Amino acid sequence: MEPSATPGPQMGVPTEGRERSPEPPDYEDEFLRYLWRDYLYPKQYEWVLIAAYVAVFFVALVGNTLVCLAVWRNHHMRTVTNYFIVNLSLADVLVTAICLPASLLVDITESWLFGHALCKVIPYLQAVSVSVAVLTLSFIALDRWYAICHPLLFKSTARRARGSILGIWAVSLAVMVPQAAVMECSSVLPELANRTRLFSVCDERWADDLYPKIYHSCFFIVTYLAPLGLMAMAYFQIFRKLWGRQIPGTTSALVRNWKRPSVQLEEQGQGLGAEPQPRARAFLAEVKQMRARRKTAKMLMVVLLVFALCYLPISVLNVLKRVFGMFRQASDREAVYACFTFSHWLVYANSAANPIIYNFLSGKFREQFKAAFSCCLPGLGPCVSLKVPSPRSSASHKSLSLQSRCSVSKASEHVLLTSVTTVLP
């Protein structure tokens, strides 16, 4: 039997006094340690980015969850617009919970660490959430445009809104399938592929260079440029209708319309404690409806503007990269990296911005948020129910208050005119 060729003690050969040959250094492990220490470990400004991502993560999850709970627990908030707002919040929760952590790790390590399967799933879900957000905002604008500019052409209902939401998700899931089909995971350093996932990339793989140019040009037009243009025109007409002088929305027009009911009230000689005429009550209800519509339109315009600003950088950078082939041989790599990283963060910041907008521009959502936080944080005040009084009880309280103030016809006219001045912004 031949002696073993492996190093170590052999039978019958003394080992005392013999020195073992040193093992050869593992250059691959040393190289990986160098990459982690000097290249992959977050730098100072990247820690700021991590903190910003963490803040967006918690604000987006908590805020959008509260939006969904507020509408779910309060029947009076289940309007068509709020159904679409809940759908937008669900898309924001999806992209925040699944896509944000992956984007953060990719931006910091510049490596895809999640394998081949998630390389297809996560970008696909991100594209779906973008499509859902754009279509939802478009349906909100369309609903408001019909309700305010052409109320007799189309009547929006909760049932139609729910059907539209199902259609939005079905279309988004189907249209974004090509995004999942072209995503592939590969390693920049194939010799290290079996030892580490560092320097693996998840990127698009197309059969021809022409295909990505066509796809991303269409993606930019369909999911950003065209919808925003149409929504801008719709809200411009809504703005003119709600704030224009030609409609009965200004104080002078309201005063003129009120004169006739007040004169009739005096002629009929109604005494003390008389309620305002039905026409006067309807008139005041119209004024309040105008005020509510203005507030809602203002909030939705701000939501659309913030969405456009947050998605503009990444949309432009993707077109420059995929369509025009820029950034392949970038001389200033750090600047390009900073631009893409900041644009990625802006996309997720939009998900956190929406609940903040609702809080500042919607009194109903603000009340629900305050009630929820008062239950979680005792220092903010006593815990109150997330459900608010029904509109019927609130209306009866207001009716009693108005009745007590309408002692004579002149007094009722003064009260209503004062209400008109304060109701309209």
UniProtKB/Swiss-Prot annotation:
It is a multi-pass membrane protein. Disulfide bonds join C119-C202. This is Orexin/Hypocretin receptor type 1. GO terms for cellular component: plasma membrane. Residues 68-82, 141-160, 236-298, 361-425 are cytoplasmic. It is found in: Cell membrane. InterPro entries: GPCR_Rhodpsn, GPCR_Rhodpsn_7TM, Orexin_rcpt, OX1R. GO terms for molecular function: G protein-coupled receptor activity; orexin receptor activity. The record marks W36 as: Important for responses to orexin. Residues 26-41 are annotated as: Required for response to orexin-A. Residues 1-25 are annotated as: Disordered. Belongs to the G-protein coupled receptor 1 family. Keywords: Cell membrane, Disulfide bond, G-protein coupled receptor, Glycoprotein, Membrane, Receptor, Transducer, Transmembrane, Transmembrane helix. The chain crosses the membrane at residues 47-67, 83-105, 120-140, 161-182, 214-235, 299-321, 337-360. Its main location: membrane. The keyword ATP-binding does not apply. One of its GO terms (biological process) is feeding behavior. Moderately selective excitatory receptor for orexin-A and, with a lower affinity, for orexin-B neuropeptide. Triggers an increase in cytoplasmic Ca(2+) levels in response to orexin-A binding. Glycans are attached at N194. It comes from Bos taurus. The N-terminal region is required for orexin signaling. Residues 1-46, 106-119, 183-213, 322-336 are extracellular.
